[in-house]
Amino acid sequence: MTLKSLPAWTALQSHFEQIRHARLRDWFAPENDRAPTRAERFTIPGGGLAADFSKNRIDDETLRLLVQLARDAGVEARRDAMFAGEIVNPTEGRAALHTALRATDPQAPFHAQVSAERAKMATFARAVRSGTWTGYTGKRIRHVINIGIGGSDLGPKMVVHALHHVATPEISTHFVSNVDGADLARVLEQVDPEETLAIIVSKTFTTLETMTNARSLRDWFVARGCPEDALAKHFVGVSANPAEVVKFGIAADNVFEMWDWVGGRYSLWSAVGLSIMIAIGPEQFDELLAGANDMDRHFREAPLERNLPVLLGLIGIWYRNFFGSQSYLVAPYSEALHYLPSYLQQLEMESNGKSARLDGTFVDYPTSAVTWGEPGTNGQHAFFQMLHQGPTIVPIDFIAVLTPEHPLASHHPKLLANCFAQSEALMLGRTLEEARKVAGPGKEALAPHLTFPGNRPTTTLLVDALTPRTLGALIALYEHKVLVQATVWDINPFDQWGVELGKILGKVVEADLSAESVDPAKHDSSTTALIERARAALKR
Protein backbone atom coordinates (compact mmCIF):
# COMPACT_ATOMS: atom_id res chain seq x y z
CA MET A 1 0.00 0.00 0.00
CA THR A 2 1.17 3.54 -0.71
CA LEU A 3 1.40 6.06 2.11
CA LYS A 4 -1.79 7.91 1.24
CA SER A 5 -3.78 4.69 1.14
CA LEU A 6 -2.82 3.66 4.68
CA PRO A 7 -5.82 3.77 7.06
CA ALA A 8 -3.90 5.86 9.59
CA TRP A 9 -3.06 8.46 6.91
CA THR A 10 -6.70 8.83 5.98
CA ALA A 11 -7.65 9.12 9.65
CA LEU A 12 -4.96 11.76 10.19
CA GLN A 13 -6.32 13.83 7.31
CA SER A 14 -9.74 13.91 8.95
CA HIS A 15 -8.23 14.57 12.36
CA PHE A 16 -6.14 17.43 10.96
CA GLU A 17 -9.27 19.21 9.74
CA GLN A 18 -10.73 18.93 13.24
CA ILE A 19 -7.62 20.16 15.05
CA ARG A 20 -5.94 22.60 12.66
CA HIS A 21 -7.42 25.71 14.28
CA ALA A 22 -7.02 24.56 17.90
CA ARG A 23 -5.02 26.97 20.07
CA LEU A 24 -2.16 25.85 22.26
CA ARG A 25 -2.91 28.58 24.78
CA ASP A 26 -6.39 27.10 25.21
CA TRP A 27 -4.97 23.64 25.85
CA PHE A 28 -2.65 25.13 28.49
CA ALA A 29 -5.40 27.23 30.10
CA PRO A 30 -5.75 26.39 33.82
CA GLU A 31 -9.33 25.21 33.42
CA ASN A 32 -8.24 22.69 30.76
CA ASP A 33 -4.77 21.69 31.94
CA ARG A 34 -5.59 19.51 34.93
CA ALA A 35 -3.46 16.72 36.41
CA PRO A 36 -1.75 15.00 34.86
CA THR A 37 -0.86 18.25 33.14
CA ARG A 38 -0.25 18.53 29.45
CA ALA A 39 3.47 18.95 30.14
CA GLU A 40 3.50 15.78 32.24
CA ARG A 41 1.66 13.77 29.59
CA PHE A 42 3.84 14.94 26.72
CA THR A 43 7.31 14.94 28.34
CA ILE A 44 9.15 11.72 27.49
CA PRO A 45 12.53 10.56 28.86
CA GLY A 46 14.84 8.31 26.92
CA GLY A 47 18.51 7.50 26.45
CA GLY A 48 19.56 9.96 29.14
CA LEU A 49 17.62 12.84 27.56
CA ALA A 50 14.09 14.17 27.91
CA ALA A 51 11.80 15.78 25.36
CA ASP A 52 8.91 18.13 26.12
CA PHE A 53 6.48 17.76 23.21
CA SER A 54 3.68 19.63 24.97
CA LYS A 55 4.01 22.86 22.97
CA ASN A 56 3.25 21.05 19.73
CA ARG A 57 -0.10 21.27 17.97
CA ILE A 58 -1.06 17.75 18.91
CA ASP A 59 -3.40 16.08 21.34
CA ASP A 60 -3.66 12.51 22.57
CA GLU A 61 -5.59 11.47 19.48
CA THR A 62 -2.96 12.99 17.19
CA LEU A 63 -0.26 10.92 18.83
CA ARG A 64 -2.38 7.78 18.74
CA LEU A 65 -2.93 8.17 15.00
CA LEU A 66 0.69 9.07 14.28
CA VAL A 67 1.89 6.00 16.14
CA GLN A 68 -0.58 3.92 14.17
CA LEU A 69 0.86 5.44 10.99
CA ALA A 70 4.32 4.28 12.08
CA ARG A 71 2.99 0.77 12.59
CA ASP A 72 1.11 0.76 9.29
CA ALA A 73 4.24 1.96 7.48
CA GLY A 74 6.45 -0.75 9.01
CA VAL A 75 8.74 1.37 11.18
CA GLU A 76 9.37 -1.45 13.65
CA ALA A 77 10.23 -3.96 10.94
CA ARG A 78 12.62 -1.60 9.17
CA ARG A 79 14.26 -0.64 12.45
CA ASP A 80 14.84 -4.29 13.31
CA ALA A 81 16.15 -5.03 9.81
CA MET A 82 18.69 -2.22 10.13
CA PHE A 83 20.00 -3.44 13.48
CA ALA A 84 20.19 -7.02 12.16
CA GLY A 85 22.43 -6.00 9.27
CA GLU A 86 19.92 -6.69 6.52
CA ILE A 87 20.06 -4.78 3.23
CA VAL A 88 18.24 -1.54 4.03
CA ASN A 89 20.05 0.48 1.35
CA PRO A 90 18.68 -1.32 -1.71
CA THR A 91 19.97 1.08 -4.38
CA GLU A 92 23.54 0.27 -3.33
CA GLY A 93 22.84 -3.24 -2.03
CA ARG A 94 24.20 -2.47 1.42
CA ALA A 95 23.42 -2.72 5.09
CA ALA A 96 23.48 0.43 7.24
CA LEU A 97 25.28 -0.66 10.37
CA HIS A 98 26.40 2.52 12.07
CA THR A 99 24.73 1.08 15.17
CA ALA A 100 27.22 -1.82 15.10
CA LEU A 101 30.02 0.69 15.67
CA ARG A 102 28.75 1.36 19.19
CA ALA A 103 27.19 -2.03 20.03
CA THR A 104 28.44 -3.84 23.12
CA ASP A 105 26.90 -7.21 22.29
CA PRO A 106 29.61 -9.60 21.02
CA GLN A 107 26.95 -11.09 18.72
CA ALA A 108 26.41 -7.76 16.95
CA PRO A 109 27.36 -7.73 13.26
CA PHE A 110 31.09 -7.20 12.59
CA HIS A 111 31.79 -6.91 16.33
CA ALA A 112 35.32 -8.38 16.17
CA GLN A 113 36.26 -6.23 13.17
CA VAL A 114 34.92 -3.06 14.80
CA SER A 115 36.65 -3.80 18.12
CA ALA A 116 40.00 -4.46 16.44
CA GLU A 117 39.90 -1.20 14.48
CA ARG A 118 38.90 0.78 17.56
CA ALA A 119 41.79 -0.75 19.51
CA LYS A 120 44.16 0.33 16.73
CA MET A 121 42.68 3.84 16.88
CA ALA A 122 43.13 3.94 20.66
CA THR A 123 46.78 2.89 20.48
CA PHE A 124 47.50 5.58 17.92
CA ALA A 125 45.50 8.27 19.76
CA ARG A 126 47.32 7.55 23.02
CA ALA A 127 50.68 7.79 21.26
CA VAL A 128 49.80 11.18 19.79
CA ARG A 129 48.29 12.50 23.04
CA SER A 130 51.23 11.36 25.17
CA GLY A 131 53.87 12.75 22.83
CA THR A 132 55.43 9.39 22.01
CA TRP A 133 54.32 9.82 18.40
CA THR A 134 56.42 12.69 17.12
CA GLY A 135 56.99 14.58 13.91
CA TYR A 136 60.03 14.16 11.70
CA THR A 137 62.20 16.42 13.90
CA GLY A 138 61.21 14.67 17.12
CA LYS A 139 58.79 17.33 18.30
CA ARG A 140 55.46 16.22 19.76
CA ILE A 141 52.26 16.74 17.76
CA ARG A 142 50.42 19.91 18.78
CA HIS A 143 48.14 20.34 15.75
CA VAL A 144 45.84 17.85 14.05
CA ILE A 145 44.35 18.77 10.66
CA ASN A 146 41.34 16.67 9.63
CA ILE A 147 40.84 16.85 5.86
CA GLY A 148 37.50 15.53 4.64
CA ILE A 149 34.13 16.76 3.47
CA GLY A 150 30.51 15.95 4.22
CA GLY A 151 30.32 13.14 6.73
CA SER A 152 34.12 13.04 6.94
CA ASP A 153 34.08 16.59 8.30
CA LEU A 154 30.73 17.70 9.73
CA GLY A 155 30.37 15.02 12.41
CA PRO A 156 33.93 15.11 13.78
CA LYS A 157 34.01 18.92 13.69
CA MET A 158 30.71 19.15 15.54
CA VAL A 159 31.79 16.69 18.24
CA VAL A 160 35.27 18.14 18.79
CA HIS A 161 33.78 21.61 19.19
CA ALA A 162 31.02 20.35 21.50
CA LEU A 163 33.44 18.49 23.76
CA HIS A 164 36.14 21.14 23.90
CA HIS A 165 35.79 21.17 27.69
CA VAL A 166 37.02 17.57 27.95
CA ALA A 167 39.64 17.78 25.18
CA THR A 168 43.37 17.91 25.80
CA PRO A 169 44.76 21.46 25.79
CA GLU A 170 48.02 20.11 24.35
CA ILE A 171 46.60 19.57 20.85
CA SER A 172 44.57 21.91 18.63
CA THR A 173 42.26 20.29 16.10
CA HIS A 174 41.56 21.97 12.76
CA PHE A 175 39.11 20.98 10.04
CA VAL A 176 39.50 21.62 6.32
CA SER A 177 36.73 20.68 3.90
CA ASN A 178 36.25 23.26 1.17
CA VAL A 179 38.11 23.00 -2.14
CA ASP A 180 38.42 26.79 -1.91
CA GLY A 181 42.11 27.16 -1.09
CA ALA A 182 41.31 29.81 1.49
CA ASP A 183 40.06 27.09 3.83
CA LEU A 184 43.39 25.25 3.93
CA ALA A 185 45.50 28.41 3.70
CA ARG A 186 43.97 29.88 6.86
CA VAL A 187 44.71 26.73 8.82
CA LEU A 188 48.29 26.54 7.55
CA GLU A 189 48.90 30.05 8.88
CA GLN A 190 48.28 28.68 12.38
CA VAL A 191 50.41 25.54 12.42
CA ASP A 192 54.04 24.41 12.41
CA PRO A 193 54.78 21.49 10.05
CA GLU A 194 57.12 19.92 12.60
CA GLU A 195 54.23 19.63 15.07
CA THR A 196 51.34 18.84 12.71
CA LEU A 197 49.54 15.58 11.96
CA ALA A 198 47.19 15.30 8.98
CA ILE A 199 44.25 12.90 8.95
CA ILE A 200 42.95 12.43 5.40
CA VAL A 201 39.41 11.02 5.48
CA SER A 202 37.64 9.76 2.37
CA LYS A 203 35.70 6.55 1.84
CA THR A 204 36.98 6.20 -1.74
CA PHE A 205 40.12 8.32 -1.37
CA THR A 206 39.17 9.94 -4.67
CA THR A 207 36.90 12.74 -3.39
CA LEU A 208 37.80 15.89 -5.35
CA GLU A 209 37.81 18.35 -2.46
CA THR A 210 39.59 16.06 -0.03
CA MET A 211 42.32 14.90 -2.38
CA THR A 212 42.96 18.42 -3.70
CA ASN A 213 43.52 19.62 -0.14
CA ALA A 214 45.56 16.53 0.75
CA ARG A 215 47.94 17.04 -2.17
CA SER A 216 48.37 20.72 -1.34
CA LEU A 217 49.06 19.85 2.29
CA ARG A 218 51.64 17.25 1.29
CA ASP A 219 53.37 19.81 -0.94
CA TRP A 220 53.34 22.29 1.97
CA PHE A 221 55.12 19.82 4.25
CA VAL A 222 57.82 19.12 1.68
CA ALA A 223 58.28 22.80 0.82
CA ARG A 224 58.89 23.53 4.50
CA GLY A 225 61.58 20.95 4.96
CA CYS A 226 59.91 17.62 5.67
CA PRO A 227 61.72 14.89 3.69
CA GLU A 228 59.34 12.85 1.56
CA ASP A 229 60.46 9.67 3.27
CA ALA A 230 59.46 11.23 6.62
CA LEU A 231 55.90 12.14 5.62
CA ALA A 232 54.70 8.95 7.32
CA LYS A 233 55.22 10.76 10.63
CA HIS A 234 52.69 13.39 9.58
CA PHE A 235 50.01 11.64 7.48
CA VAL A 236 47.41 9.01 8.27
CA GLY A 237 44.46 7.97 6.14
CA VAL A 238 40.93 6.79 6.89
CA SER A 239 39.23 5.01 4.01
CA ALA A 240 37.35 1.99 2.72
CA ASN A 241 39.93 1.87 -0.09
CA PRO A 242 43.31 1.18 1.59
CA ALA A 243 45.06 0.55 -1.73
CA GLU A 244 44.28 4.08 -2.88
CA VAL A 245 45.56 5.48 0.43
CA VAL A 246 48.90 3.72 -0.03
CA LYS A 247 49.01 4.86 -3.66
CA PHE A 248 48.71 8.44 -2.42
CA GLY A 249 51.85 7.90 -0.36
CA ILE A 250 50.57 7.16 3.13
CA ALA A 251 52.28 4.23 4.85
CA ALA A 252 50.17 1.08 5.06
CA ASP A 253 50.58 1.04 8.85
CA ASN A 254 49.00 4.50 8.96
CA VAL A 255 45.75 3.44 7.29
CA PHE A 256 42.57 3.14 9.37
CA GLU A 257 39.62 1.32 7.88
CA MET A 258 36.04 2.40 7.40
CA TRP A 259 33.49 0.16 5.73
CA ASP A 260 30.95 0.42 2.94
CA TRP A 261 28.20 -0.63 5.33
CA VAL A 262 28.55 2.71 7.13
CA GLY A 263 27.32 5.82 5.33
CA GLY A 264 29.46 8.93 5.54
CA ARG A 265 26.93 10.99 7.48
CA TYR A 266 26.62 8.15 10.02
CA SER A 267 30.35 7.50 10.32
CA LEU A 268 31.73 9.62 13.17
CA TRP A 269 31.57 6.53 15.40
CA SER A 270 34.15 4.77 13.20
CA ALA A 271 37.77 5.62 12.36
CA VAL A 272 36.31 8.74 10.75
CA GLY A 273 36.20 9.92 14.36
CA LEU A 274 39.96 9.53 14.85
CA SER A 275 40.32 13.30 15.28
CA ILE A 276 37.67 13.09 18.01
CA MET A 277 39.52 10.31 19.81
CA ILE A 278 42.82 12.21 19.68
CA ALA A 279 41.11 15.32 21.06
CA ILE A 280 39.14 13.77 23.92
CA GLY A 281 40.95 10.46 24.48
CA PRO A 282 39.87 6.84 23.95
CA GLU A 283 37.99 6.60 27.25
CA GLN A 284 35.82 9.61 26.50
CA PHE A 285 35.32 8.37 22.94
CA ASP A 286 33.99 5.14 24.44
CA GLU A 287 31.55 7.26 26.47
CA LEU A 288 30.38 8.93 23.25
CA LEU A 289 29.69 5.48 21.81
CA ALA A 290 27.97 4.40 25.02
CA GLY A 291 25.56 7.33 24.82
CA ALA A 292 24.66 6.45 21.25
CA ASN A 293 24.16 2.85 22.35
CA ASP A 294 21.85 4.06 25.14
CA MET A 295 19.66 5.70 22.49
CA ASP A 296 19.91 2.62 20.25
CA ARG A 297 18.50 0.49 23.07
CA HIS A 298 15.77 3.02 23.77
CA PHE A 299 14.83 3.08 20.06
CA ARG A 300 14.66 -0.73 19.95
CA GLU A 301 12.96 -1.35 23.28
CA ALA A 302 10.68 1.57 24.16
CA PRO A 303 7.06 1.32 23.03
CA LEU A 304 6.37 3.56 20.06
CA GLU A 305 4.14 5.80 22.20
CA ARG A 306 7.11 6.58 24.50
CA ASN A 307 9.92 6.36 21.95
CA LEU A 308 11.84 9.60 21.42
CA PRO A 309 13.13 9.03 17.87
CA VAL A 310 9.74 7.75 16.77
CA LEU A 311 7.84 10.70 18.26
CA LEU A 312 10.33 13.27 17.00
CA GLY A 313 10.08 11.84 13.50
CA LEU A 314 6.30 11.52 13.50
CA ILE A 315 5.74 15.05 14.76
CA GLY A 316 8.01 16.27 11.97
CA ILE A 317 5.80 14.42 9.48
CA TRP A 318 2.71 15.98 11.06
CA TYR A 319 3.98 19.47 10.25
CA ARG A 320 5.57 18.63 6.89
CA ASN A 321 2.75 16.61 5.38
CA PHE A 322 -0.35 18.01 7.04
CA PHE A 323 0.45 21.61 8.01
CA GLY A 324 2.64 22.05 4.93
CA SER A 325 5.69 23.42 6.74
CA GLN A 326 8.61 23.92 4.37
CA SER A 327 11.40 24.04 6.94
CA TYR A 328 12.20 23.33 10.54
CA LEU A 329 14.65 25.00 12.88
CA VAL A 330 17.16 23.48 15.29
CA ALA A 331 18.05 25.99 18.02
CA PRO A 332 20.60 24.65 20.51
CA TYR A 333 20.91 27.03 23.44
CA SER A 334 24.51 25.94 23.79
CA GLU A 335 27.51 27.49 22.07
CA ALA A 336 29.20 24.11 22.41
CA LEU A 337 26.57 22.76 19.99
CA HIS A 338 27.33 25.51 17.47
CA TYR A 339 27.89 23.04 14.63
CA LEU A 340 24.96 20.75 15.41
CA PRO A 341 22.56 22.49 12.96
CA SER A 342 25.01 22.16 10.05
CA TYR A 343 25.62 18.51 10.97
CA LEU A 344 21.87 17.89 11.02
CA GLN A 345 21.44 19.63 7.67
CA GLN A 346 23.40 16.85 6.03
CA LEU A 347 21.92 14.10 8.18
CA GLU A 348 18.33 15.11 7.43
CA MET A 349 18.42 16.54 3.91
CA GLU A 350 20.98 14.22 2.33
CA SER A 351 19.14 11.26 3.86
CA ASN A 352 15.54 12.21 3.18
CA GLY A 353 15.69 14.77 0.38
CA LYS A 354 14.40 12.16 -2.07
CA SER A 355 11.51 11.86 -4.53
CA ALA A 356 11.80 8.21 -5.55
CA ARG A 357 10.14 5.54 -3.44
CA LEU A 358 11.85 2.26 -2.71
CA ASP A 359 9.94 0.65 -5.59
CA GLY A 360 11.12 3.31 -8.06
CA THR A 361 7.85 5.20 -8.32
CA PHE A 362 7.74 8.87 -7.36
CA VAL A 363 6.18 10.33 -4.25
CA ASP A 364 3.15 12.59 -4.42
CA TYR A 365 3.82 14.15 -0.99
CA PRO A 366 6.63 16.26 0.50
CA THR A 367 9.62 14.55 2.08
CA SER A 368 12.53 16.26 3.88
CA ALA A 369 11.95 19.76 5.18
CA VAL A 370 14.71 22.33 4.89
CA THR A 371 16.77 21.99 8.07
CA TRP A 372 18.48 25.07 9.44
CA GLY A 373 19.53 26.67 12.69
CA GLU A 374 21.83 28.77 14.82
CA PRO A 375 22.73 28.63 18.51
CA GLY A 376 20.68 30.64 20.97
CA THR A 377 20.69 33.41 21.84
CA ASN A 378 22.29 34.52 18.56
CA GLY A 379 19.27 33.52 16.51
CA GLN A 380 16.99 35.74 18.58
CA HIS A 381 18.81 38.76 17.17
CA ALA A 382 18.73 37.48 13.59
CA PHE A 383 15.65 35.54 12.46
CA PHE A 384 13.35 35.10 15.46
CA GLN A 385 11.42 38.14 14.26
CA MET A 386 10.16 36.01 11.37
CA LEU A 387 9.40 33.07 13.65
CA HIS A 388 7.25 35.20 15.93
CA GLN A 389 5.44 37.53 13.52
CA GLY A 390 5.91 36.16 10.02
CA PRO A 391 3.08 34.35 8.21
CA THR A 392 5.09 31.12 7.90
CA ILE A 393 4.96 28.43 10.57
CA VAL A 394 8.40 26.96 11.30
CA PRO A 395 8.48 24.09 13.82
CA ILE A 396 11.43 24.38 16.18
CA ASP A 397 13.56 21.98 18.20
CA PHE A 398 14.99 23.87 21.17
CA ILE A 399 17.90 22.09 22.87
CA ALA A 400 18.68 23.17 26.43
CA VAL A 401 21.70 21.98 28.42
CA LEU A 402 20.71 22.40 32.06
CA THR A 403 24.17 22.70 33.62
CA PRO A 404 27.10 24.61 32.10
CA GLU A 405 30.32 22.95 30.98
CA HIS A 406 32.34 26.16 31.53
CA PRO A 407 33.32 28.23 34.62
CA LEU A 408 31.09 31.25 33.82
CA ALA A 409 28.11 29.74 35.61
CA SER A 410 26.40 33.10 36.21
CA HIS A 411 25.61 33.30 32.48
CA HIS A 412 23.64 30.08 32.47
CA PRO A 413 20.34 31.16 34.07
CA LYS A 414 20.12 33.93 31.47
CA LEU A 415 20.69 31.42 28.66
CA LEU A 416 18.07 28.98 29.94
CA ALA A 417 15.60 31.78 30.65
CA ASN A 418 15.82 32.89 27.04
CA CYS A 419 15.31 29.37 25.73
CA PHE A 420 12.25 28.65 27.84
CA ALA A 421 10.79 32.13 27.34
CA GLN A 422 11.06 31.84 23.57
CA SER A 423 9.13 28.58 23.55
CA GLU A 424 6.47 30.13 25.79
CA ALA A 425 6.20 33.30 23.69
CA LEU A 426 5.92 31.34 20.46
CA MET A 427 3.14 29.26 21.98
CA LEU A 428 1.17 32.05 23.68
CA GLY A 429 1.54 34.90 21.22
CA ARG A 430 -0.16 38.22 21.95
CA THR A 431 -3.72 39.06 20.90
CA LEU A 432 -4.77 42.41 19.45
CA GLU A 433 -6.55 43.24 22.69
CA GLU A 434 -3.41 42.50 24.68
CA ALA A 435 -1.35 44.52 22.20
CA ARG A 436 -3.60 47.56 22.67
CA LYS A 437 -2.87 47.49 26.40
CA VAL A 438 0.86 47.25 25.73
CA ALA A 439 0.74 50.11 23.21
CA GLY A 440 -1.06 52.37 25.65
CA PRO A 441 -3.58 55.19 25.22
CA GLY A 442 -3.48 57.11 21.96
CA LYS A 443 -1.35 54.50 20.17
CA GLU A 444 -4.09 52.38 18.61
CA ALA A 445 -2.25 52.33 15.26
CA LEU A 446 0.76 50.66 16.88
CA ALA A 447 -1.21 47.74 18.31
CA PRO A 448 -1.28 45.53 15.16
CA HIS A 449 2.51 45.70 15.03
CA LEU A 450 2.69 44.46 18.61
CA THR A 451 0.54 41.38 18.02
CA PHE A 452 2.02 37.88 17.87
CA PRO A 453 0.00 35.08 16.24
CA GLY A 454 1.31 32.49 18.69
CA ASN A 455 0.38 28.84 18.25
CA ARG A 456 3.88 28.28 16.88
CA PRO A 457 4.97 24.70 17.60
CA THR A 458 8.15 23.82 19.46
CA THR A 459 9.79 20.79 21.04
CA THR A 460 12.28 21.30 23.87
CA LEU A 461 14.98 18.67 24.30
CA LEU A 462 16.58 18.69 27.75
CA VAL A 463 20.15 17.56 28.37
CA ASP A 464 21.20 17.50 32.02
CA ALA A 465 24.87 18.16 31.20
CA LEU A 466 26.83 18.10 27.95
CA THR A 467 29.07 15.06 28.28
CA PRO A 468 30.37 12.62 25.69
CA ARG A 469 27.61 10.23 26.73
CA THR A 470 24.71 12.67 26.43
CA LEU A 471 26.09 14.03 23.16
CA GLY A 472 26.24 10.51 21.76
CA ALA A 473 22.61 9.97 22.73
CA LEU A 474 21.55 13.26 21.16
CA ILE A 475 23.22 12.47 17.84
CA ALA A 476 21.76 8.96 17.74
CA LEU A 477 18.31 10.40 18.50
CA TYR A 478 18.41 12.37 15.26
CA GLU A 479 19.90 9.47 13.30
CA HIS A 480 16.96 7.29 14.25
CA LYS A 481 14.45 10.09 13.69
CA VAL A 482 15.64 10.16 10.07
CA LEU A 483 15.01 6.42 9.69
CA VAL A 484 11.49 6.76 11.11
CA GLN A 485 10.60 9.49 8.62
CA ALA A 486 12.21 7.68 5.70
CA THR A 487 10.20 4.56 6.49
CA VAL A 488 6.91 6.44 6.57
CA TRP A 489 7.80 8.25 3.33
CA ASP A 490 8.94 4.93 1.78
CA ILE A 491 12.32 6.27 0.68
CA ASN A 492 15.95 5.21 1.12
CA PRO A 493 17.78 7.41 3.68
CA PHE A 494 21.14 5.73 3.11
CA ASP A 495 22.06 6.75 -0.45
CA GLN A 496 22.81 10.17 -1.94
CA TRP A 497 22.57 10.00 -5.70
CA GLY A 498 21.62 13.67 -5.77
CA VAL A 499 25.25 14.72 -5.35
CA GLU A 500 26.43 12.86 -8.45
CA LEU A 501 25.20 14.86 -11.45
CA GLY A 502 26.82 18.10 -10.37
CA LYS A 503 30.12 16.28 -9.74
CA ILE A 504 30.06 14.76 -13.23
CA LEU A 505 29.34 18.08 -14.91
CA GLY A 506 31.88 19.78 -12.66
CA LYS A 507 34.70 17.76 -14.24
CA VAL A 508 33.60 18.90 -17.70
CA VAL A 509 33.42 22.54 -16.62
CA GLU A 510 36.81 22.34 -14.90
CA ALA A 511 38.39 21.10 -18.13
CA ASP A 512 36.70 23.88 -20.09
CA LEU A 513 38.07 26.53 -17.71
CA SER A 514 41.61 25.67 -18.81
CA ALA A 515 40.85 24.83 -22.45
CA GLU A 516 41.87 27.05 -25.36
CA SER A 517 38.22 27.51 -26.30
CA VAL A 518 34.80 26.30 -25.21
CA ASP A 519 32.44 24.53 -27.59
CA PRO A 520 29.13 26.39 -27.11
CA ALA A 521 27.26 23.19 -27.93
CA LYS A 522 28.57 21.53 -24.75
CA HIS A 523 26.61 23.74 -22.36
CA ASP A 524 23.58 26.00 -22.20
CA SER A 525 24.21 29.65 -23.01
CA SER A 526 24.23 30.72 -19.35
CA THR A 527 26.86 28.17 -18.31
CA THR A 528 28.97 28.93 -21.39
CA ALA A 529 28.93 32.64 -20.55
CA LEU A 530 29.90 31.95 -16.93
CA ILE A 531 32.82 29.79 -18.08
CA GLU A 532 34.02 32.47 -20.49
CA ARG A 533 33.94 35.15 -17.81
CA ALA A 534 35.84 32.92 -15.40
CA ARG A 535 38.41 31.96 -18.06
CA ALA A 536 39.12 35.63 -18.69
CA ALA A 537 39.52 36.32 -14.97
CA LEU A 538 41.78 33.31 -14.40
CA LYS A 539 44.13 34.49 -17.16
CA ARG A 540 44.64 37.87 -15.52
Swiss-Prot record:
Cystine pairings recorded for this chain: none
Single GO term (MF): glucose-6-phosphate isomerase activity
KW Cytoplasm (keyword) present: yes
GO-annotated cellular components: cytosol
Pathway membership: Carbohydrate biosynthesis; gluconeogenesis; Carbohydrate degradation; glycolysis; D-glyceraldehyde 3-phosphate and glycerone phosphate from D-glucose: step 2/4
Catalytic activity of the protein: alpha-D-glucose 6-phosphate = beta-D-fructose 6-phosphate
Primary location group: cytoplasm
Keywords recorded for this protein, A-Z: Cytoplasm, Gluconeogenesis, Glycolysis, Isomerase
Active-site residues annotated for this sequence: 350, 381, 503
Subcellular location: Cytoplasm
Pfam families, per database record: PGI
Gene Ontology process terms (BP): gluconeogenesis; glucose 6-phosphate metabolic process; glycolytic process
Assigned EC number: 5.3.1.9
InterPro entries: G6P_Isomerase (IPR001672), G6P_Isomerase_C (IPR023096), Phosphoglucose_isomerase_CS (IPR018189), SIS_dom_sf (IPR046348), SIS_PGI_1 (IPR035476), SIS_PGI_2 (IPR035482)
Family: Belongs to the GPI family.
Functional note: Catalyzes the reversible isomerization of glucose-6-phosphate to fructose-6-phosphate.
Protein's name according to its UniProt entry: Glucose-6-phosphate isomerase
Organism, scientific name: Burkholderia orbicola (strain MC0-3)
